[in-house]
């Protein structure tokens, strides 16, 4: 069955003129409220995956589940939280069953668009005790929800991936529901961490609710609603302005994944883009059938990645709102990789989504020159670690996404050592890693020659090495090992990602493996990809090549291979 999805905004022009200055004040107040939620979570979270890596998103929604504001944290969650909010409200019986002080827990992948370890906390917001004005929500990564491992690349159904909380009231009228709380504790290997992070999320949604109430009470609900219409209109105009610059027509391209995590072999997928004026359709209906392994993307995830791509492209640096999404139509076919049917596994849907964003840009870069960057390293190059805790006999778990090089663009070199452009996460400090986990960080270095050559070179990837101080298990999740990050406008490809297990019996490539056992003294090495180059390398200036040599970003051999025009000069 073919399905289409579009933002549910259905507004007419506001009936009264609203002071544009007041609209801006309310818009920025909403952005500030979402940022306050973010700061509250960071300051009170238990796990580094939240307060250092920033694997979360906080947002505010109107009563129709349209996004008023989202904090600048994890763009990959953009658009999925609205699905979470709507699904969680539906699961508890609809708006009529909501009361002031209710808080809902939701993590069903098919309603949230994330894997089950991304748990959403949703709070309806009221004024005058019974007038619903909107919702606050925070989705954050929990270290373990009771799946077959704390993180898996080889699940064959959604039930292996963790406990599903399909919209449960954690608080009713301000009172904790003890049975739900006990259920959460009983279904995690690291309950202290989960409860600590849950409490931080609760603080965050409450802070956002208070802020939203202050805004509405200060300006009045009618003025607030009219201003919101103007805010959505502004967001829509921004995106339509960019889309209208794309020539009308149908464009298409292919992406691929190294494997689906269970079966051997590359998984290729096709995306079509149809442009008509300022309207744009992203067509995923020719995707392969849903996969046996966990790279399937539930509909909310597919919608989210499309929204991220065009918000970054057209958002002009503004924090997004629902208006950004109105010009976009997403078309899928049920039962395929980008619209699977439960219980198909989907734990790694985020990795497929990362490829979607860059394939969209690749397709458009071939039609619209000088706008889109070259490919990044294309992956989070992540690891999730766990163990029994030999020193204190307490199980532990942690996650570590590793930065990559970003693609070069028209006018500049790619950014070095930064997480994927749709992830927005960051690397934990070495001191945090070593103080909380039984390993030593032997190496974190910029990877010489990992960048793609060009008039503007790509960013560099990293080389990292972790040495185990006790028996440890790790799941590695690394894509783009079989095909390198591409260049644009005759720019060259960059180094691909790879992971190497270093044991007493030798070295082994392990880019996508679940539950690898590492003994004391063994190490694992991550080699993250660089960014592709932009423009012909022959056009790169002597000055820039010389500076790259001085900084040891590239070697003499690299220069000889890619920059034959280089002339040595006296320093």
Residue ranges and their predicted role:
Residues 2-100, 105-128, 132-281, 285-570:
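Glycine/proline-enriched, intrinsically flexible loops and inter-domain linkers
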